[in-house]
Amino acid sequence: MLFGNPTCMKALQFTLLVGLMLLQPLASFGQRYGDEDEAPLIPQEDFDELLMWMVDGKYEKVLYKAIRYTEDDDTKKEPVPYVFMSMAFFKISESSDEELLEKYSKALKDALKYASKFVKKDKEKEYIGEYVDYFNDLRRATMNQAEIYVDDEKFTKAKSYYKYMWTLDTEDPGAWLMYGSVLWKAKAVRDAQESWNTAEQLLIEYGGKGLEEVQQDLLKYAVIYTAEMLADEGNLTDARKWIEATDALFGTDREVQAVLRSL
């Protein structure tokens, strides 16, 4: 009955996901130094241990061990420990353990902080391609939290989440667009215009191609929110501009086109 048990299935799926996600980058990590006949700065056994702790839900153990590598002068430039930190914090943020959530009350933000550091350390993009699924889950949770703050008109708090989103991917037009819109709401007009300009240039250059599904969802939300916001202020020209700029993606989207017709 193992495979008929939803809880067991979920655990199995998570185990397989993490295993597939981490196996390749860790192998590459070891090979990177093996080519030069040098011992790796971080032993493969340590990564295996971190992986097993992730699978077993021992997230605090992951944090305690991985953070040592992020703070040690010899290993702090290595990207992989940062993504372990990020994943552990993210799983804590999703936990139903109230004591754990109270202890790590900023777990989602910490997950974003270490994910951002991972991206910066992975300058050659050697590892990031192996963590696409994780980053998409992180984006989704971040987008949801930011939307809550937007709905509550807590724009300064929302701003920090959208900033993390474009830090994870500087070519994410939806993140830049929403970052600009919450800055606009916070009366930071100049910064808002700069962020909007970045979003516009990305849409002109790429037309929304190559975005992950969650990034497309963010862009749709950003376009609708920004267009309606500008329309409410009487700026119909710019409101239409943003919807038309994403026509390649949302030209047949009923919700987006309904907003356009209302302008």
Task: Describe every region a protein language model picked out.
Residues 31-103:
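Start-of-domain marker
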Residues 33-35, 214-217, 222-263:
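Terminal, low-structured helical/coil segments at or just beyond the last alpha-helical repeat
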Residues 49, 85, 92, 138, ...:
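Structural register within alpha-helical repeat arrays
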Residues 76, 87-140, 202-221:
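Short coil/linker segments at helix-helix boundaries
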Residues 79-81, 175, 209-210, 222, ...:
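TPR alpha-solenoid repeat register
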